[in-house]
């Protein structure tokens, strides 16, 4: 079994892909199966959030694996009204719901109770299978070297 021990920034030839849902992309240790069927182990620094497009390598750099964000069951809220979208973010944030925030769109793990709450605000909520890339604060530190402070 090969062990993926580091995220790399420099361009390198990809030798395999690894499709993972968010609940595995937040873990520093996991047994995984690469796109080509080989088993691998994640042995990464704690607090690293993997994003689609990130690249991991073995300690010797012989293997470079590109992360693909898996399609997941998500609720999608699309709205051109920034006030309504902000209202949705506020209410979901109060419930500590991990959110992916895009221009005119929100995504969160599918939850019919939350869907119904947002529909009461006249928002359109649909179900989809899409990659889920929530804001880093919901899980761990951002993987791309920048940090957004948060204090209470």
From Swiss-Prot:
Record key words, sorted: Chaperone, Cytoplasm, Nickel, Nickel insertion
A Pfam short name: UreE_C
InterPro entries reported for this sequence: UreE, UreE_C_dom, UreE_N, UreE_N_sf
GO molecular function term, any single one: nickel cation binding
Principal location: cytoplasm
Annotated Gene Ontology cellular component terms: cytoplasm
Subcellular location: Cytoplasm
A Gene Ontology biological process term: urea metabolic process
NCBIfam families xref list: PRK13261.1-1
Free-text function comment from the UniProt entry: Involved in urease metallocenter assembly. Binds nickel. Probably functions as a nickel donor during metallocenter assembly.
Family membership noted in the UniProt record: Belongs to the UreE family.
Protein's UniProt name: Urease accessory protein UreE
Organism listed in the record: Citrobacter koseri (strain ATCC BAA-895 / CDC 4225-83 / SGSC4696)
